[in-house]
């Protein structure tokens, strides 16, 4: 039984909070979308009513990212993990390899999945620093054999983030941006492929998207499972089969919300303010500590520990009672994690820091 009659602050890593404004629009349109007498989730993906939704979603995303016509967008049913299989199949011929900078669980999963199809060259491994830092990568770090470089730009579990996107010129840069896409300004031309699960900054779970430079489509010559084939999905405008229609609709609303705020430039300033507020407090505290190197601290996932682990359960229990949900760290690392994606308002972080101060004062 839930104790709260109003919305709480969800700091979970994902599925994450959605903007209240988006939820209100979705609720208002749920039973009768644009006078159709149907919910969006009931509309056929072949009807013009939904085709307008997916077309508008792509237009809005292109506007947010200043995306040129030399890149294509495709929406997929399923999370970012499916791209761990899709990428080598789409980008590599048999016998070729790719490079990976290993900075956490998600690069390890991409590496392991890639080995089912091709060789993988690990050009950086942050295991020895316990995944508390990320590398500064240039062409000089490349293996010389790989056809692309795979990175995870923000690591949700360990709370690390590339402060600057690597400038790789010799081969395409492929980035898993699941937990940070649309949170800060990027130059898409720095990438060959960007992919992301939706459940952090884009929309509900069960949806992912890929942004693919057009010259990388159809280059492998391999037999690719149809729903993993980037060329097929692009050619069919993500409508080869029934897509995650309602998730795409929510993503469209999120894109509209973000543009209304002022776009990525505006939300980046808010995200920097939120991250600074919580990191500054942690660094000044005698109870809390952040294990991540300062240069590599994520602005999306703030990882921290209590110096007295005996207080962990008490901290979580009291946080929940105060409407601060999902602060437990990942099961592999423990501790705590505050995920402060785009939809987390500044007031949520202010309330969290106030609670943390109050909790410390009572110890």
UniProtKB/Swiss-Prot annotation:
Pfam families: Aminotran_5 (PF00266). Its EC number is 2.6.1.52. InterPro entries: Aminotrans_V_dom (IPR000192), Aminotrans_V_PyrdxlP_BS (IPR020578), Pser_aminoTfrase (IPR022278), PyrdxlP-dep_Trfase (IPR015424), PyrdxlP-dep_Trfase_major (IPR015421), PyrdxlP-dep_Trfase_small (IPR015422). Binds 1 pyridoxal phosphate per subunit. Coiled coil: none annotated. GO terms for molecular function: O-phospho-L-serine:2-oxoglutarate aminotransferase activity; pyridoxal phosphate binding. Homodimer. Transmembrane segments: none annotated. This is Phosphoserine aminotransferase. One of its GO terms (biological process) is pyridoxine biosynthetic process. It comes from the Bacteria. One of its GO terms (cellular component) is cytoplasm. Keywords: Amino-acid biosynthesis, Aminotransferase, Cytoplasm, Pyridoxal phosphate, Pyridoxine biosynthesis, Serine biosynthesis, Transferase. The keyword Transferase applies.
């Amino acid at each position: 039984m839930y104790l709260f009659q109003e919305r709480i602050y969800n700091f979970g890593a994902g599925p994450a909070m959605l903007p209240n404004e988006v939820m209100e629009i979705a609720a208002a349109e749920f039973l009768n979308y644009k006078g159709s007498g149907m919910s969006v989730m009931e509309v056929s993906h072949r009807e013009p009513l939904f085709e307008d939704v997916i077309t508008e979603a792509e237009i809005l995303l292109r506007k947010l990212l200043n995306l040129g016509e030399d890149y294509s967008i495709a929406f997929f049913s399923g999370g970012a993990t499916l791209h761990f299989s899709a990428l080598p199949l789409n980008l590599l011929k048999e016998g070729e390899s790719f490079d990976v900078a290993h900075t956490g669980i998600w690069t390890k999963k991409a590496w392991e999945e890639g080995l089912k199809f091709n060789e993988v060259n690990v050009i950086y491994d942050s295991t020895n620093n316990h995944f508390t830092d990320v590398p500064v990568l240039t062409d000089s770090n490349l293996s010389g054999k790989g056809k692309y470089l795979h990175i995870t730009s923000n690591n949700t579990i360990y709370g690390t983030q590339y402060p600057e996107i690597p400038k790789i010129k010799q081969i395409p840069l492929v980035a898993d941006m699941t937990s940070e896409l649309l949170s800060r300004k990027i130059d898409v031309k720095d990438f060959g492929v960007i992919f992301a699960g939706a459940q952090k900054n884009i929309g509900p779970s069960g949806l992912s998207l890929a942004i693919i430079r057009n010259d990388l489509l159809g280059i492998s010559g391999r037999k690719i499972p149809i729903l993993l084939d980037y060329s097929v999905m692009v050619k069919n405008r993500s409508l080869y089969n029934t897509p995650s229609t309602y998730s795409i609709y929510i993503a469209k609303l999120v894109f509209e919300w973000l543009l209304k705020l002022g776009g990525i430039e505006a939300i980046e300033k808010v995200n920097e303010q939120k991250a600074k507020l919580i990191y500054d407090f942690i660094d000044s505290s005698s109870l809390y500590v952040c294990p991540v190197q300062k240069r590599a601290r994520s602005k999306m996932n703030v990882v921290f520990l209590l110096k007295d682990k005996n207080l962990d359960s008490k901290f979580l229990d009291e946080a929940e009672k105060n409407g601060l949900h999902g602060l437990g760290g990942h099961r592999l690392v423990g501790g705590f994690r505050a995920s402060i994606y785009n939809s987390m308002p500044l007031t949520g972080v202010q309330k969290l820091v106030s609670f943390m101060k109050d909790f410390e004062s009572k110890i």
